[in-house]
């Protein structure tokens, strides 16, 4: 296999970051501070019972309802998932300067195309295959089967959000700091995006099955990244590399021991497709420009820090980030392509868009490492652009979702 081959659809989205950023040092300090604060009696610190900050009680209920609606045992039940039709209307029912009577406008100002049975459907499958062919890594003839299989796996390998939300409050705080630390390490080592998302999935699934003390959260995070790299990377980091980034807190024997234990708990099942696979598919079909793709990638990484997003499927998370990105960039329409491929319309995503916007309000406290990474020229300073947009659109941020 040629390691120099690039994925055409996402070739500009790598993990480059300026070496001048002291990401690891800042995150290490955060982890140590939270460990000291919660090391004495963490058991009595639980999530507050009031509504989640930043979204309404209706949206809070909707998030839990959406999670419960597709919850299934990954080990005992066969998930039956109907294949979604990939045929899309790419050149019909387009939005012109004069809005079509078949369009509605969302609260974010995006024109939403409604279905029209009279629209022409000429050569849709051929057009879709041509767009798939733009990326050599896509097997066109098996596209529908691959997507159907991915949809099954994304549910099968979801963490148990209800168990995670019942954990002591210090676990949530430590998780956020550890994820910021993982992002910093992942960026410095220059790993694939898939490795980052899989590592958080491994960590969350482990946390939903085991109670982890604060003192071992960082070890679990490093081990989750180690496992994900072995699964995704051609040249994964070594145990010695992890010892260096852990700065002597844990030795190789500790890492290997935790690796064995985590894999045993997870029953060696690591086939989660992750959001990058769905993002690549939607990028090809929708011909998204570089700015929107990078912005979606930024939102996906921000969502890793917020535990409430672990209740979403990978495809649902990508759809949420895509809608938010289109809102900020003032894209002209929310086409039928994304709902037909992912199965989510914009109305089913509004609650999660509000939550994402709330997370983006204060990047320096919520996701400093990710903000710093995407503030670099390599990523077109996309995080600063988003922060400026939020600062000048306080009316959107004040919406309660009603």
Swiss-Prot record:
Identify one Gene Ontology CC term for this UniProt entry: cytoplasm
Entries under SUPFAM superfamilies matching the protein: Cyclin-like
> What InterPro entries does UniProt report for this protein, alphabetically?
Cyclin (IPR039361), Cyclin-like_dom (IPR013763), Cyclin-like_sf (IPR036915), Cyclin_C-dom (IPR004367), Cyclin_N (IPR006671), Cyclins_cyclin-box (IPR048258)
Q: Name one GO molecular function term.
A: cyclin-dependent protein serine/threonine kinase regulator activity
**Gene3D superfamilies reported for this sequence:** Cyclin-like (1.10.472.10)
Q: What keywords were assigned to this record?
A: Cell cycle, Cell division, Cyclin, Meiosis
Q: Write down a Pfam family by its short name.
A: Cyclin_N
The cross-references to CDD domains, in alphabetical order and at most eight, read: CYCLIN_CCNO_rpt1
Answer yes or no on keyword 4Fe-4S.
Answer: no
Which GO biological process categories is it annotated with?
cell division; nuclear DNA replication; reciprocal meiotic recombination; regulation of meiotic cell cycle; signaling
> What's its job?
Required for pre-meiotic DNA synthesis and S phase progression. Regulates levels of meiotic intragenic recombination.
Protein family according to the UniProt entry: Belongs to the cyclin family. Cyclin AB subfamily.
Protein name stated in the entry: Meiosis-specific cyclin rem1
